[in-house]
């Protein structure tokens, strides 16, 4: 993995999380490809490598892009100009496309609750887990009254235990220590 990929990853991840949140992955993909094409054009490439101020550079770039980019993309361009990151934009695009590819697959999560969850609670849990795992979530939903209250989330070998039973066990272990 190159240093440029390491620098690009947080940008790509932030963009991808925004795209998931706004349900606009395809729109962002097209926008990033469009921005990349502008950056890669010979005339613009020379212009971007000059010693212009970040505000002038971002204003110029936004002018060139015109109505093809929205407010969020304009903010991204301002951020890239401010941090002098236009040179790694191709890496940002590649990282975004990797995240999109992994997102297309479903992550299977076992969700165990003490009682039946309401639909909006399941949707909220799914949204949070999609942000954490950066993939679509498919639930295997079970009810287990023995956990008393709360939920347990299992993904392969990883377990997030937010059950009352688990808290009571931890408390018991501390008191018996």
Curated annotation (Swiss-Prot):
Q: Which UniProt keywords apply?
A: ATP synthesis, Cell membrane, CF(1), Hydrogen ion transport, Ion transport, Membrane, Transport
Q: Where is the signal peptide?
A: none
Regarding protein family, the annotation reads:
Belongs to the ATPase delta chain family.
Which GO terms of the molecular function aspect are on file?
A: proton-transporting ATP synthase activity, rotational mechanism
| Subunit details | F-type ATPases have 2 components, F(1) - the catalytic core - and F(0) - the membrane proton channel. F(1) has five subunits: alpha(3), beta(3), gamma(1), delta(1), epsilon(1). F(0) has three main subunits: a(1), b(2) and c(10-14). The alpha and beta chains form an alternating ring which encloses part of the gamma chain. F(1) is attached to F(0) by a central stalk formed by the gamma and epsilon chains, while a peripheral stalk is formed by the delta and b chains.
Q: SUPFAM superfamilies of this UniProt entry?
A: N-terminal domain of the delta subunit of the F1F0-ATP synthase
Q: Gene of origin?
A: atpH
Concerning InterPro entries, the annotation shows:
ATP_synth_OSCP/delta_N_sf, ATPase_OSCP/dsu
Q: What is this protein called?
A: ATP synthase subunit delta
Q: Where in the cell is it found?
A: Cell membrane
Manganese as UniProt keyword: no
Free-text function comment from the UniProt entry: F(1)F(0) ATP synthase produces ATP from ADP in the presence of a proton or sodium gradient. F-type ATPases consist of two structural domains, F(1) containing the extramembraneous catalytic core and F(0) containing the membrane proton channel, linked together by a central stalk and a peripheral stalk. During catalysis, ATP synthesis in the catalytic domain of F(1) is coupled via a rotary mechanism of the central stalk subunits to proton translocation. This protein is part of the stalk that links CF(0) to CF(1). It either transmits conformational changes from CF(0) to CF(1) or is implicated in proton conduction.
Q: Name one GO cellular component term.
A: plasma membrane
- Topology of this chain in the membrane: Peripheral membrane protein
State the source organism's domain of life.
Bacteria
């Amino acid at each position: 993995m190159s240093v440029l990929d390491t620098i690009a990853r947080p940008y790509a991840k932030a963009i991808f999380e925004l795209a998931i949140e706004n349900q606009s992955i395809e729109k962002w993909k097209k926008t990033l490809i469009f921005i990349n094409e502008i950056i890669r054009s010979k005339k613009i490439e020379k212009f971007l490598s000059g010693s212009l101020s970040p505000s002038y550079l971002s204003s110029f770039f936004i002018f060139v892009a015109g109505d093809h980019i929205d407010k969020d993309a304009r903010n991204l361009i301002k951020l890239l100009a401010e941090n002098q990151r236009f040179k790694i934009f191709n890496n940002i695009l590649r990282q975004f496309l990797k995240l999109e590819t992994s997102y297309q697959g479903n992550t299977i999560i076992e969700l165990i609750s003490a009682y039946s969850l309401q639909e909006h609670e399941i949707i909220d849990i799914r949204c949070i887990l999609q942000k954490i795992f950066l993939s679509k979530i498919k639930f295997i939903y079970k009810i287990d009254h023995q956990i008393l209250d709360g939920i347990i989330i299992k993904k392969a070998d990883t377990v997030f235990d937010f059950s009352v039973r688990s808290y009571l066990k931890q408390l018991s272990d501390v008191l018996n220590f």
